Amino acid sequence: MPNWGGGKKCGVCQKTVYFAEEVQCEGNSFHKSCFLCMVCKKNLDSTTVAVHGEEIYCKSCYGKKYGPKGYGYGQGAGTLSTDKGESLGIKHEEAPGHRPTTNPNASKFAQKIGGSERCPRCSQAVYAAEKVIGAGKSWHKACFRCAKCGKGLESTTLADKDGEIYCKGCYAKNFGPKGFGFGQGAGALVHSE
């Protein structure tokens, strides 16, 4: 067919491709709207195209159609397949069921795997969405408060003693140094006898 218009023909639809809508690949021209995978119709670009003869594919479809065949091939990385290869005579042994540990002093890792951590204040399970870590333990956001005054705490504003958490003020009053000049705040002197 003669090319009277002088423009290049699209490798898919065979219509004239003008410069503003042209995509070039392997010496052929395509309309941007025609530069699609022949199988799945995904848009392609220079990093995702694979060419076979005059046909263009995304890399995934190209691999499925023209890549190596057989057990373990053609799916690509990260793809889960339920084919166990039984048609090829491959036999699989059943794995024994999971048995929980009977060790009363299981490691912290084993305790975490076995179930969720427990909040030291309310003893309920602590899930990721409500977890705050302080004093080396996981707490609910609502339970992460001073044991004396109930003030909300942050991991940088707490002090801990005997597994309980306190604000700095309550900790200083209850567990800080005692005696002349201590425990009343700045500028106050108290004589304790």
From Swiss-Prot:
Gene name in the database record: CSRP1
Function: Could play a role in neuronal development.
Alphabetized PROSITE patterns for the sequence: LIM_DOMAIN_1, LIM_DOMAIN_2
GO MF assignments: actinin binding; RNA binding; structural constituent of muscle; zinc ion binding
Domain of life per record: Eukaryota
A Pfam family hit: LIM
Gene Ontology cellular component list: cytoplasm; extracellular exosome; focal adhesion; nucleus; Z disc
Quaternary context: Interacts with ASCC1; ASCC2 and TRIP4.
Start and end residues of each LIM zinc-binding domain: 10-61, 119-170
Name this polypeptide is given: Cysteine and glycine-rich protein 1
Organism phylogeny: Eukaryota, Metazoa, Chordata, Craniata, Vertebrata
Main location: nucleus
Motif (Nuclear localization signal): 64-69
One of the protein's GO biological processes: platelet aggregation
Phosphoserine, modified sites: 81, 192
